[in-house]
Design a protein with these regions (language model features):
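Extracellular glycoside hydrolase catalytic/binding regions
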Residues: 117, 130-288
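Terminal, non-catalytic domain-edge segments
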Residues: 285-298
């Protein structure tokens, strides 16, 4: 960041733009950012499109930074800018997911011309904000290279990536892996087996093949079996072992969790809707390990 080496350490905070508690004020937002930093987090993975019908915390039909005709929803764009300003003050960054396969499969879709219009408009709005990376899709690959070209035309220096598919989909279509600045696959989860052994091998393959930074972008998590979650009980050590192995590879991590999927009023979701590192003993244990990255990653 700012021309200096940056050890990417992310957190899933998909609903950040649309969360009332996080956006109550700049002071409140910075309080949360400082708490994330305390536990080693320096990147938030945030979704521009949060309008699926799956009942996640803070989803709604208007919860997207663009209309389906490609025009921007300016109030949400302004909130995103405020997040970027406050994150920048803390030397933090945002990975912004443009399009969601969840919305696509709910038949909430943006056409080719409309998506190009939205990408171009938002890219130009965010030109002054250099602490945001663009991720084309969450777990999908539809016209990805076209979208990358549109992003680069509007902002040639912006870092761009893509998540090509769900758990275990770590291959990139021809030309895509080469075109991206860094790679963000969603590695194997519990249903395939011992993810803490399999996922690092998947990342190692990508590092060797493409020779560019790789982030374990949305790895196996705890909680509900829905939406790609585990069918059996999980333990904090499951995540810790995988994180440790990813670090030792020279790759980077994002902590993925169950603090959004089941919606407000359920035991897994904090009342604030913010992924609070101290919300449960399970999460706190993993976050405390992440905070010790310098100790264990060498």
């Amino acid at each position: 960041m700012d021309g200096q080496p940056f050890t990417y350490t992310g957190l899933s905070f998909f609903n950040a733009i649309y969360n009332p508690a996080f956006n109550k004020s700049s002071e409140e937002r910075i309080r949360w950012l400082e708490k994330f930093q305390k536990y080693g987090i320096n990147v938030l993975r945030v979704w521009a499109q949060w309008d699926s019908r799956r009942g996640y915390a803070d989803t709604c039909p208007e919860c997207t930074v663009y209309f389906t005709d490609g025009r921007l929803r300016q109030p949400h764009v302004e909130t995103l800018k405020q997040i970027l300003v406050d994150a920048g003050k803390q030397k933090m960054a945002v990975e912004l997911v443009f399009f969601s396969q969840e919305s696509w499969h709910d038949n909430i879709r943006v056409g080719p011309e409309e998506s190009a219009r939205a990408i171009t408009a938002l890219s130009k709005e965010l030109l002054p904000y250099r602490n945001v990376m663009f991720q084309v899709w969450n777990e999908f690959d539809e016209r990805t290279l076209d979208h990358v070209k549109t992003m680069r035309a509007a902002d040639p220096k912006r870092l761009v990536t893509n998540s090509p598919g769900g758990a275990g989909v770590v291959y990139y279509a021809r030309g895509q892996g080469e075109a991206l600045d860094y790679l963000t696959p969603h590695t194997t989860r519990q249903r395939t087996g011992r993810h803490w052994e399999i996922a690092p091998k998947e990342l190692s393959y990508l590092l060797e093949r493409y020779g560019k930074p790789v982030v374990d972008d949305e790895p196996a998590r705890n909680g509900t079996p829905n939406f790609g979650g585990p069918a059996e009980k999980t333990y904090p050590s499951d995540q810790m072992i995988q994180i440790y192995k990813v670090w030792r590879l020279g790759a980077y991590i994002t902590y993925h969790h169950d603090m959004i999927q089941t919606g407000y009023g359920t035991p897994a979701v904090p009342p604030s809707g913010v992924p609070d590192p101290e919300f449960s003993p399970y999460h706190r244990a993993v976050f405390e390990f992440i905070a010790l990255r310098d100790r264990y990653s060498r």
